Amino acid sequence: MRDPPAPLFRRDNMLEFYFSYRGVLKRLRSGALGGEMDRLAEHFLTLGYKRASAKIYLSRVARFSQFAATRCGLMPIHQDVIDSYLGTFTTDTPRIGAVSALAHARRVAPERFIIPVPSEEADPDALLLASFSDYLRTVRGLEPKTREGILLGGRRFLDWFRHRHPGQNLEALTAEHVLAAVEHRLSLSATSGTRTAATSHIRTFLRFLCWAGHHRQDLARIVPRTPYWRLAHLPPRLAWGDVRRAIDAIGATTPVAIRDRAVLLLLATTGIRNGELRAIRLQDIDWRTGEVFIRRTKGKRDRVVPLLEETGAALVDYILRARPKVDSPYLFLSFTPPVGAFKSAAPVSRIVRKRLRHGGVELGRVAGAHLLRHSLATQLVGQRRPINEVADLLGHRSINTTALYVKVAASQLAEVALPFPGGAA
């Protein structure tokens, strides 16, 4: 059962939303963190925590606040005080609960804590990787998700080099070292796609080392290119009847079910990517034209996708009846506190897998938002829809990419009229 809407409280008396007894309120507002407890109460309310859960967290922080007052009074709280408090617990469960509650307190009132400064020696490559990240962003112009993968590749290369050649400077890096590192990475890669990505990431990192002056030579040319046939395998996809059955199996009886049905319908009827779905804001839906604005996609350009009537109705139902009442601009929100936008692709993938299995669909190794994207593309091509129309819907800049997704025949590609260089038809 959902909590009733919160009445209006001033920021200095938010505790009254959760507690009513004067003695309890007085105890909560005393101690080392007493002056921050109303802010903390507002924090839990803003994040959509249920009342019972918020009261538990507030009580845990209050117990620590009383303990800290005996050690440091109203002075900033040092890590030693926290460690001493956690040492009073004899079992893991209450200790874990206290750690979680204190994490919220630190987030709300960081000025009340003295955070130990980590040793610069803890990560000798931190500055180098930060510079590499800046290079990928400013020089290469790459998106955050792409940078994340390449940074991981650079980190793995450095870890290998530090482990195999401890104490050596990167200037000592040789072609033999590079080939050995590549061989090591390829031995850990199971598919042609991951092997190609691994060598590409190493190549990019080595170019950066030369560009930034960390090595006198560009050793990227040493990295061998791995064969990768993009059209060698059919992309995983479902029969459209299976997709339809999974959607119909979702009963719109709970807020979670209403949200999940809207998620599956939007993915299945527009072919948008996982990250694109998570980035949709309420203001991105044009209800008059029946369209959704998709921001700066994988192809680095915005696009618009059409809303089918059924999908639009599901979104309306979700917004009016199920969407948590929190201050967030994003369309789809997690129901697990802290309530807010999905922070990664994993929750959306779990929703897709759960609902497909519930609908009796047999799943292979790949089962996420992209499975529905492949399925829609295959369905559209099977209906003889123009390939360029499918490419526009999916946000592909090249029809060749659409061919990769849907495995179309060369004869169908030939039907597409390509523009003549210079603008003539």
From Swiss-Prot:
Q: Please list the coiled coil stretches.
A: none
Q: Name one GO molecular function term.
A: DNA binding
CDD domains tied to this protein:
INT_RitA_C_like
Kindly list the biological process annotations in GO that this record carries. DNA integration; DNA recombination; establishment of integrated proviral latency; symbiont entry into host cell; viral genome integration into host DNA
In this protein, the active site sits at 273, 298, 370, 373, 396, 405 (o-(3'-phospho-dna)-tyrosine intermediate)
Sorted alphabetically, which PROSITE patterns does this protein's record hold?
A: CB (PS51900), TYR_RECOMBINASE (PS51898)
List the Pfam families.
Phage_integrase (PF00589)
UniProt superkingdom: Bacteria
Core-binding (CB) domain location is 123-210
- The segment(s) forming the Tyr recombinase domain are 233-418
Keywords assigned by UniProt?
DNA integration, DNA recombination, DNA-binding, Plasmid, Transposable element, Viral genome integration, Virus entry into host cell
InterPro entries xrefs? CB, DNA_brk_join_enz, Integrase-like_cat_sf, Integrase_catalytic, Integrase_recombinase_N, Tyrosine_recombinase_XerCD
PANTHER family per the UniProt record, alphabetical: PHAGE INTEGRASE-RELATED, TYROSINE RECOMBINASE XERD
Q: What family classification does the UniProt entry report for this protein?
A: Belongs to the 'phage' integrase family.
Protein name (database record): Putative integrase/recombinase y4rF
The organism is Sinorhizobium fredii (strain NBRC 101917 / NGR234)
